[in-house]
């Protein structure tokens, strides 16, 4: 057995998307090779409704899949297939855009105004770029989970972990998507298919991964009763850890424990032509997609009554 070393690490950066949603970009719009088959990941965590309520109005996608995982709050969604629904705490939506879909995602938060979730973009292989669009909406109660004797809790969103199968299936890159919470000062190892590329994203607490000499997390200084004291920021510091080759990931949680996503997939190793919400294999395919969008012929499969509007 070999522990996967850390190939690179970084912190998510603040940005704005949609109609003015404040979020943190974990990775994306750069070199896709280290993350193949994944393209982009965002962490949308906000307790200020004015910074997320304008949401992501109607917009197109082609050639990708989007995976939305909600921890807190609600996200209302609709699409050109006629789907309508609401994602709430713990729910997952896996959307395959395929040949083309137009949809909207409108976060509404919870009663306290809190909104927290993640969206991951996965590339589609060349022979599936123009497949029929589809949705998988998974309610929190349908997601497999297990708790080890040491208190480690694992939600299996996609893939297979120790015989627990994720509710999301039928995905070409056969991804593994685990939400893992480890109690304080605990060392764990997780199997990692050698054929896959993958990463961890820490969003609560701190931990050492593999060959790391210092914990990923954040110590902040706050004043209490006139005295400064160091405490562990339980929001985590939005740290991305990308792994090298090996068949296991080793993690030791910090003083306050850790919660992170462990995600992997089989690399496609195909050309990537990417502009905005559309990802194809060549510039010509990309240009054709935008021509169709502007001509009102983008959506190939729509709900009864759906009308393609040029430029939408």
Q: Language-model segments: what does each one mean?
A:
Residues 1-312:
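Jelly-roll (double-stranded beta-helix
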């Amino acid at each position: 057995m070999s522990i996967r070393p850390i190939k690179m690490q970084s912190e998510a950066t603040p940005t704005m998307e949609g109609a003015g949603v404040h979020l943190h970009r974990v990775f994306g719009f750069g070199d896709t090779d280290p993350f193949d088959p994944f393209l982009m990941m965002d962490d949308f965590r906000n307790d200020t409704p004015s910074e997320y309520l304008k949401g992501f109005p109607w917009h197109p996608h082609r050639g990708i899949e989007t995976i939305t995982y909600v921890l807190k709050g609600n996200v209302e969604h609709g699409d050109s297939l006629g789907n309508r629904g609401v994602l709430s705490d713990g729910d997952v939506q896996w959307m395959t855009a395929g040949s083309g879909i137009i949809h909207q995602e409108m976060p509404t938060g919870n009663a306290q105004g809190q909104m927290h979730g993640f969206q991951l973009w996965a590339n589609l292989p060349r022979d599936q770029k123009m497949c029929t669009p589809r949705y998988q909406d998974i309610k929190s109660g349908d997601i497999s989970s297990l708790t080890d004797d040491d208190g480690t809790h694992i939600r299996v969103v996609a893939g297979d972990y120790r015989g627990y199968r994720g509710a999301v299936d039928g995905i070409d890159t056969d991804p593994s998507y685990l939400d893992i919470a480890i109690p304080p000062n605990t060392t764990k190892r997780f199997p990692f298919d050698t054929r896959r590329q993958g990463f961890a994203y820490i969003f609560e607490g701190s931990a050492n991964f593999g060959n790391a000499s210092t914990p990923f997390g954040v110590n902040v200084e706050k004043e209490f009763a006139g005295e400064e004291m160091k405490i562990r920021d339980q929001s985590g510091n939005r740290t991305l850890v990308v792994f090298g080759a090996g068949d296991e990931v080793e993690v030791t949680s910090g003083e306050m424990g850790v919660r992170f996503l462990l995600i992997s997939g089989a690399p496609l190793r195909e050309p990537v032509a990417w502009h905005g919400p559309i990802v194809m294999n060549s510039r010509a395919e990309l240009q054709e997609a935008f021509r169709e969008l502007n001509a009102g012929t983008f959506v190939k499969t729509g709900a009864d009554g759906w009308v393609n509007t040029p430029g939408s």
